[in-house]
């Protein structure tokens, strides 16, 4: 399928008459940082300490959910236990400690190039993440100075994490944008599902073990192998999107 056909297909299934891209809603873990391997390791450690059997692959598939949602679901299915909000908060604090003990996750190769290309095209960059870890969020300003707007949505801001579209709908509200004004950059099926449900043109990047086909199945309009490939393609993509005005 050509790029023009992909855009036409997006317009068809959303019912949009055109596009006017002025914002990019961008995930954090697995997009800006190569951090998912640390997260999955910390999650497995937390669960095993509490007698819950699991694998790292399970947590790659749950990426995008809030920490509280993951804890409540895993304790319910793995231990038959209903976890309160306070208990989930305390357990998430333990998981965060395990995550920190693994060291700082590196910046994802190509992430700065993608953000700079968007900035050069005057496309607002809005962070949309299910993360509730303040330590990781604090790194954004240090690692990507001047590359993000003040508008952002984290796991602290939503009641329902991805795949519910709430994070992206809230981000659009904060940035005063409509779905046909936004592209989304995501690496996980649940995030792609959420972006698709929100009506945004959705770009997947396969920065982890999840294959391209799973991102397309979740609703991605385009999928790139990594952030460097996306950075190289962005100028052409943004021009193509700009030619389909509402």
PLM segments and residue spans:
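Asp-based, Mg2+/Mn2+-dependent phosphohydrolase catalytic module
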Residues: 1-22, 116-119, 132-246
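Metal-dependent phosphoesterase signature
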Residues: 9, 75-113
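Helix-loop "lid/cap" segments that line or gate small-molecule binding pockets
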Residues: 46-47, 66-83, 139, 172
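Conserved phosphate-coupling serine/threonine residues in phosphotransfer and NTP-handling enzymes
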Residues: 31, 129-131
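Short, surface-exposed acidic
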Residues: 52-61, 79-91, 146-149
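An amphipathic alpha-helix signature
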Residues: 40, 44, 67-72, 92, ...
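Active-site neighborhood of HAD-like aspartate-dependent phosphohydrolases
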Residues: 2-60
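Conserved SAM-binding loop
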Residues: 32, 107, 125, 184-185, ...
């Amino acid at each position: 399928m050509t790029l023009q056909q992909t855009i036409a297909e997006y317009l068809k299934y959303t019912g949009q008459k055109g596009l006017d891209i002025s914002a990019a809603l961008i995930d954090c873990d697995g997009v800006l940082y190569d951090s998912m391997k640390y997260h999955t390791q910390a999650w497995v450690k937390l669960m095993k300490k509490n007698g819950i059997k699991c694998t790292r692959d399970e947590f790659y598939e749950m990426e995008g959910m809030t920490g509280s949602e993951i804890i409540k679901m895993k304790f319910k299915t793995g231990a038959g236990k209903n976890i309160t909000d306070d208990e989930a908060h305390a357990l998430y604090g333990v998981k965060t400690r395990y995550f920190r003990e693994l060291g700082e996750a590196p910046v994802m190769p190509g992430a700065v190039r993608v953000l700079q290309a968007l900035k050069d095209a005057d496309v607002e960059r809005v962070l949309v993440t299910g993360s509730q870890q303040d330590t990781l969020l604090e790194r954004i300003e240090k690692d990507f100075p001047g590359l993000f707007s003040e508008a952002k949505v984290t796991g602290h801001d939503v009641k329902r994490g991805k795949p519910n579209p709430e994070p992206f709908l809230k981000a659009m509200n904060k940035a005063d944008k409509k779905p046909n004004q936004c592209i989304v950059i995501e690496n996980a099926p649940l995030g792609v599902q959420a972006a698709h449900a929100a009506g945004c043109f959705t770009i997947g990047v396969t920065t982890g073990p999840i294959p391209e086909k799973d991102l397309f199945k979740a609703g991605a309009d385009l999928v790139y192998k990594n952030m460097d490939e996306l950075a190289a393609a962005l100028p052409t993509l943004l021009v193509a999107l700009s030619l389909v005005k509402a």
